[in-house]
Design a protein with these regions (language model features):
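Short glycine/serine/threonine-rich phosphate/pyrophosphate-binding segments
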Residues: 53, 76-77
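Short, acidic (Asp/Glu-rich) active-site segment that either coordinates a divalent metal cofactor
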Residues: 77, 88-91
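N-terminal glycine-rich flavin-associated loop
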Residues: 10, 35-67, 91-129
Length: 129
């Protein structure tokens, strides 16, 4: 069980409304598209920066709390399920295109960038993804 003290620390790292303990949210983050598997985390946290992720991981490590990174929950292998409970680390707010390097044909993106958004951004530069 995650203590109130840890929840308070999470609230300091990622301010409301991005720390969730309500049953509806936990249920929504308990599954992906894998049939018949449901493992709710004890808390869902939605950071918006690498620093917030680092601080969450430091806190979780200090208290030996498992952390499961969660994306769009469209996977078919159960890889993003919180089978040990703990913290569900939703990456959905990390959705920015950091850089489009036209010379080297590379992009740097955050993990939740939507493919169509990326395709449209590079198309504006005459590129294709």
């Amino acid at each position: 069980m995650i203590s109130e003290a840890v929840l308070d620390e999470l609230q300091k790292i990622v301010t409301s409304p991005f720390v969730f303990t309500d049953q509806e949210t936990l249920l929504n983050y308990s599954h992906d598209q894998t049939e018949d598997l449901s493992f709710p985390p004890q808390v869902v946290v939605k950071p918006e920066s690498a620093q917030e992720i680092s601080d969450i991981l430091k806190l979780a490590n200090h208290h030996k709390i498992p952390v499961t990174p969660i994306g769009a929950r469209t996977g078919l292998s159960g890889g993003a399920l919180s089978i040990f409970g703990g913290i569900g680390l939703s990456l959905e707010r990390l959705n920015k295109i950091i850089e489009i390097d036209e010379k080297n044909l590379q992009v740097t993106v955050e993990p939740a960038v939507i493919t169509q958004v990326l395709q449209e951004a590079v198309l504006e530069k005459g590129l294709f993804y």
